[in-house]
């Protein structure tokens, strides 16, 4: 029994006795420096390698996904209106617009009010296109007047109708500037000169009618221009000489315009009015000189 018992009685610390603390570890400066370097190396590795960062691991980078129209099936569809208009050329667009205006007169009126006025160059460009079509229809070689007329009848009437529509646009009171009106009439008269001449009288009525209309247009512009500054624009632009050449080329078919030039403009008809003669029977009168194309020609003085 004595053998089993401990020779020393067990020791129980007193409750008021302070517990023993473990002795403090004394770490060498070498150990602390090595651990500090290791911690710094770990931080550097984590900052260099994105996979080593716990923040990167917890947040996965998302790639931008393609925008897919969900629920919309791909199928054929008409072009939008702006794209459709881009495919139309000038003639097609003009035809579509004209059809819409004919179906809806209100839209046609709105277009006429909103569209800018045509310029002389714009009008002459359109007339030039009609003139090109007429020239292309003229047959080659010596053809009879009847055959030639029926070949060119449609483009000829189209050109004459276009002249009849454009000419009033450049006449007063629509056009207030006499120089603009005279410029248009000068080019329009040249177009009339180029209309085909036919041997038969029954085929020449288109050209004769065009001369008559253009002559009345000249007379109207001259009359209105004479009311402003005594026809200064006519004198400054030498329009009397231009008109005389046109009349001579037409074979005297611009007589109404020539009469307006003499009667309305004082400096043209001064010679005849001074002698109290209004008739054109005198071959030396201003009117006859304008008609004959001799107005402004040098006059011989003396016996030579």
From Swiss-Prot:
Residues 1-69 are annotated as: Disordered. One of its GO terms (cellular component) is cytoplasm. This is Tethering factor for nuclear proteasome sts1. It comes from Neurospora crassa (strain ATCC 24698 / 74-OR23-1A / CBS 708.71 / DSM 1257 / FGSC 987). The keyword Nucleus applies. Belongs to the cut8/STS1 family. GO terms for biological process: nuclear protein quality control by the ubiquitin-proteasome system; proteasome localization; protein transport. Its main location: cytoplasm. It is found in: Cytoplasm; Nucleus.
């Amino acid at each position: 029994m004595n053998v089993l018992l401990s020779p020393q009685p067990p020791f129980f610390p007193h409750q008021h006795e302070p517990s023993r603390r473990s002795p403090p570890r004394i770490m060498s400066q070498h150990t602390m420096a090595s651990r500090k370097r290791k911690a710094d190396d770990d931080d550097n590795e984590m900052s260099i390698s994105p996979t080593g960062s716990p923040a990167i691991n917890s947040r996965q980078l998302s790639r931008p996904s393609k925008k897919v129209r969900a629920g919309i099936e791909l199928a054929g569809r008409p072009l939008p209106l702006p794209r459709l208009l881009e495919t139309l050329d000038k003639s097609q667009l003009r035809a579509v617009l004209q059809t819409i205006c004919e179906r809806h007169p209100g839209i046609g009126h709105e277009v006429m009010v909103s569209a800018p006025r045509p310029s002389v160059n714009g009008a002459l460009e359109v007339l030039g296109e009609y003139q090109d079509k007429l020239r292309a229809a003229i047959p080659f070689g010596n053809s009879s007047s009847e055959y030639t007329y029926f070949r060119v009848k449609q483009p000829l009437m189209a050109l004459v109708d276009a002249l009849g529509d454009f000419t009033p646009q450049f006449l007063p009171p629509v056009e207030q500037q006499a120089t603009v009106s005279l410029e248009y009439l000068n080019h329009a008269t040249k177009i009339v000169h180029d209309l085909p001449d036919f041997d038969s009288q029954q085929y020449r009525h288109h050209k004769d009618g065009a001369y008559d209309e253009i002559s009345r247009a000249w007379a109207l512009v001259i009359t209105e221009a004479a009311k402003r500054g005594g026809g200064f624009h006519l004198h400054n632009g030498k329009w009397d000489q231009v008109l005389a050449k046109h009349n001579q080329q037409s074979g005297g078919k611009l007589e109404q315009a020539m009469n307006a030039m003499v009667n309305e403009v004082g400096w043209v008809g001064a010679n005849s009015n001074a002698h109290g003669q209004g008739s054109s029977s005198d071959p030396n009168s201003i009117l006859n000189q304008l008609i004959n194309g001799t107005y402004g020609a040098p006059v011989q003085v003396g016996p030579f």
